[in-house]
């Protein structure tokens, strides 16, 4: 799944090698979580998966908040900003979970790597951010990659469209994170994202909830623990290295997706997926490069 932390946080940059190692490990852990979600997905509504995943993640983060200073650190001046970000996260997660249950992991991961492209485009539209011709060229190249990965010569199914929608939702959470980060603490942002997301997803439960067997609950818990561990490793990576250094290693998620598809489901990536991945990765890496240059003193 696309990640919205590594695209905005800035670390101290004193140990890039360790940061890269932690980021690659984090992506591997989160990719493993996606395998559990793919296994669970066909039997449950994606909103139920989203609800349980967010609930478990909230329970995991609460002890850390209590240790860091208690409920006092959760004071916020921007509740609607947190609510909007949580809504984007819920819709994005539900879209990805729907797609994971119906598409090869690699297909979903390739399209999801367009998050930086969507985020840049949304920044232009809603934040009036200035984007030069170089980044516009990268955006066009990346969106061409998305079109190729969708394989328009065949039938574009609902799961593929759900992946694009989910990617757009995740991009919106990035912009909201950038805005909230100017006034809110990291603990506040993470807690309200998870807790409000749980509440939003819970609103759908009267219509989509089905009984969950004990064995499946174990898979949900495993997915929640892996998700929390992946986020911790990613946060650690961003503490010891600059975001511009570690963010490009998000693209290793494509490799993980291909490997899991081959080993578990014996699925080889299609040529449109491979070619689309090249376009999207090249465009995203170039945008990271340009943003690093623009931020340089």
Which residues are covered by each model-predicted region?
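Specific transmembrane alpha-helical segments of multi-pass solute transporters/efflux pumps
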Residues: 68-107, 112, 148, 225-240
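C-terminal-most transmembrane helix of multi-pass membrane proteins
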Residues: 2-6, 255-297
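Hydrophobic/small/kink-forming positions within alpha-helical transmembrane segments
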Residues: 27-32, 62, 86-94, 116-121, ...
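Membrane-interface interhelical linkers
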Residues: 1-28, 58-84, 195, 199-222, ...
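C-terminal transmembrane-helix exit sites in multi-pass transporters
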Residues: 98, 115-137, 255-274
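Hydrophobic transmembrane alpha-helices of multi-pass small-molecule transport proteins
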Residues: 134-150, 170, 272-291
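Transmembrane alpha-helical segments that form core, pore/gating elements
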Residues: 35-38, 46-47, 61, 153-211, ...
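Helix-helix packing/entry segments at the starts of transmembrane helices
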Residues: 108-114, 180, 184-193, 231-262
